Amino acid sequence: YERSQRNTDRYRALQAEGYNKQQIDSVFNTPVRMRVFSWNNPIDTIMSPMDSIKYYYWFLRSGLMAMEPHTGYVKAYVGGPDYRYFKYDQVKYAARQVGSTFKPFVYTMAMQEKGYKPCSEIPKIQPSIELWDGSIWAPANANKDKIGEMVTLKWALANSDNWISAHLMKEISPQSVIDLARKMGVTSPIDPVPSLCLGTAEITLCEMVGAFNTYPSQGVYVEPIFVSRIEDKYGNVLENFVPNRTQAMNEETAYTMLRTMQGVVEGGTSVRLQYRYNLRNPIAGKTGTTQNHSDGWFIGMTPYLTAGVWTGAEFRSIHFRSITYGQGAHMALPIWALFMQKVYDDPTINMPKDDFPKPMSGYDVNFDCSQENLNKWIEEF
């Protein structure tokens, strides 16, 4: 608890007054009257400052950010539960493992470099990848369906299958995926290792929302803009802010990935958006869950809004016991869904529920994998 103690205003004030470590510890272990956070209303109580630090450890934190695809304007931003008690921005500064929300970047590179399509089939078997030191990395897989069968990329992403992501990473390279992530606005340090395909990198929610926003922006990364302009008291514009833009991928790949990620919502890990929250308009997205169920993610996209949610405790050692509740579909997706319900119900926003527009080139790709595979079987027969 020492690091948390040193980060408090109380500790810094005592240190500035010349207290030594022993004196500071004595103050922190002496009960005093204080007001602490609770989900209903703040509670007036008596406890030691050290006990209050331990008390706050058990609260889940969450962050949310939403932005417009083409303008980059940030429309909603929640850095934590209550800034009076949790003075840390979980959106901009908290870099956490991203889990399966990183998989779309791997799929994007596989489509760009290797020509994969949503209905391309890969055998669902455990891949083995030789590492630089000669050891073998063979990832585990929580998904036990269709082992040994041929599965489509659309199915694999919808069900967040680890083996297929690792198979794709084996065909491309970690560095090529990192290069793509950089074009999509990710600046956090990333190690070029095969396990990157499962989301071992630690990245902020702000970066991830900005990166996902590339897909509904026709492959163009648009830097998130928090302030559009600055005016003086007379209304004179002192500064205008225009987002930086980078062509991260071609429009056709972006559209293909959007449609592939719609499968996550229509019949994969995010299907509860439809049946539990009645969000039946076109939505593409991806859940993410990290080791020991410490972090839950969901990033969802519509043609007019990209929003992401992260949920977890301040320290990874505090987490859910099992994946029953310790997964992105339970930890983060409900927040996203309730937020979007409010957006659609607000007449002042008047958010349309249109489908994602097709590329201007007229490009289209088949997403009805059952029909495509039937046609393939007939041709072979």
Pin down the residues of each PLM region.
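Short coil/loop residues immediately preceding or within conserved phosphate-binding loops
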Residues: 59-61, 151, 193
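Mid-domain, small-residue-enriched loop/turn segments at the edges of structured enzyme/sensor domains
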Residues: 136-141, 172-210, 219, 223-226
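A penicillin-recognizing enzyme superfamily signal
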Residues: 1-68, 77, 83-91, 102, ...
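Active-site rim segments in enzyme catalytic domains, especially the processed small/beta chain
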Residues: 89, 93-133, 267, 341
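Conserved catalytic neighborhood of penicillin-recognizing serine enzymes
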Residues: 116-177, 221, 233-258, 262
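Short, solvent-exposed beta-strand edge segments and adjacent coil->beta transition regions
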Residues: 93, 163-165, 193-195
